[in-house]
Amino acid sequence: TATGHTTAILSSKVKGTAVYNSGGDKIGHVEDIVLDKESDHIMFAALGFGGLLGVGEKYAPVPWSLLSYSKDKGGYVVPMSEDQIKAAPAYDLKELVKGDGEYGAIREKSYDYYKVPHYW
């Protein structure tokens, strides 16, 4: 537009954004975004779920390509159920980046679980 890019967003604004399934049920939130600094890709969103007030919460690394922003919901929608997210590989946040996610194993497990083609 003449006034600037209207779809740009800071990653700090994405953190905490609600995530919904395609049925409209809230299934979690974006806790953080993991970047691949060598390939310029967003690896995944760390989708926080479970736990109470952050205690016992786990993080499912969901490939970024699966998240679609919904203006109506003011959050992201993923094409899966809450049960599918709960059954997905889940980790502590620090594990997602330690040794490049244990040398890529976390990234590979995540992309394979969600049947998303590898970009690497």
Predicted regions located by residue number:
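Peripheral interaction segments used for macromolecular assembly
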Residues: T1-W120
